[in-house]
Regions:
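Glycine-rich phosphate/pyrophosphate-binding beta-alpha loops
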Residues: 10-16, 38-46, 73-75
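Domain-level signature for proteins that mediate thiol-based redox and metal-cofactor handling
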Residues: 211-263
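Contiguous mid-protein beta-loop-alpha structural module that forms a pocket-lining wall or clamp
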Residues: 24, 30, 34-38, 45
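Rhodanese-like catalytic fold shared by cysteine-dependent sulfurtransferases
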Residues: 63-104, 110-115, 122-155, 159-220
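A short, polar/charged loop-to-alpha-helix boundary motif
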Residues: 43-62
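Short, surface-exposed connector motifs at secondary-structure boundaries
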Residues: 33, 149-153, 245-252
């Protein structure tokens, strides 16, 4: 088996309208030589694969990905392109800064000798988590190290991998054996058993309105929230903060750029 890293960057700068997420996967060997890559998304997929394929053809390494100078403007990319970012993530593994595992490898660990640790916020954990996980938000981790057993392997994860990496560094510096799940819960969630779909159709008669008619109404119990351009856990936390401030029967409309936000 070869080292694998998953990443979920935006196709271009998140503060620029229309930023949509990519999902990227990179395979490489212990010397850093690139063995393959995959990417899916709505925008900017082809150029990332073209770049990595070119580096692969020239027998390049993950270190080469980190040094590439690629076209940059907010509508097209970020100052650090997703290709650079997946190179950084792979380089961290090769440098020994972090040890990773994939969701597919999770069943291979002895759960009696390990702790599955979710380092996301309490709101994110309540919204969905891996079975058997213990929730300690990364911001509270230093104060709650006493809740963890140093004799057990810590299997940390967050939403996409960044906070899991930070948690793994904190834990390693305090003498814990720890691995971070690359790609985080976002990668794992698509492999979890599917939730049953809502029934189709409406069983009762209802009045219909056009969008123009709805917008024309002055609804005192109506709030609009723009969660576009926020990185995790920003959108979910912003929704929770708004909901905590709302009264019963108020309606909340949420606008988000991430197609998977509804999950």
């Amino acid at each position: 088996s070869y080292p694998t890293v998953y990443l979920h960057p935006n196709a271009h700068a998140s503060y620029y309208p229309g930023a949509l997420p990519l999902t990227m996967k990179l395979l490489f060997d212990d010397s850093g030589r690139i063995l393959g890559a995959q990417a899916i998304g709505i925008d900017g997929v082809d150029k990332r694969i073209d770049v990595i394929a070119t580096v692969l053809r020239l027998k390049g390494t993950v270190a080469d990905l980190t040094e590439l100078e690629l076209a940059y403007a907010p509508p097209y990319s970020s100052a650090k392109d997703p290709v650079n970012m997946i190179g950084f993530a792979a380089e961290n593994i090769l440098a020994g800064l972090t040890d990773v595992f994939t969701y597919e490898q999770l069943p291979s660990f002895d759960r009696s000798q390990s702790i599955l640790l979710d380092v996301r916020t309490e709101a994110e954990f309540a919204n969905g988590h891996l079975p058997g996980a213990l929730n300690i938000p990364v911001d509270d981790l230093r104060q709650r190290l006493g809740e963890l057993n140093k004799d057990k392997l810590i299997l940390a994860y967050c939403q996409v991998g960044l906070r899991g990496y930070i948690a793994s560094r904190i834990l390693a510096q305090h003498g814990f054996r720890v691995k971070n799940m690359t790609g985080g819960y976002k990668t794992a969630s698509v492999q979890l058993p599917n939730k049953p779909a809502a029934p189709c159709g409406i069983e009762i008669d209802t009045e219909t309105q056009t969008v123009r008619e709805v917008k024309a109404e002055q609804k005192k119990n109506y709030r609009s929230l723009n969660a576009c351009g926020l990185s995790c856990p920003g959108p979910l936390m912003k929704v929770k903060t708004t909901l905590d401030d709302m009264d019963e029967e108020e309606i909340l409309e949420i606008t988000a750029a991430d197609p998977g936000f509804s999950d």
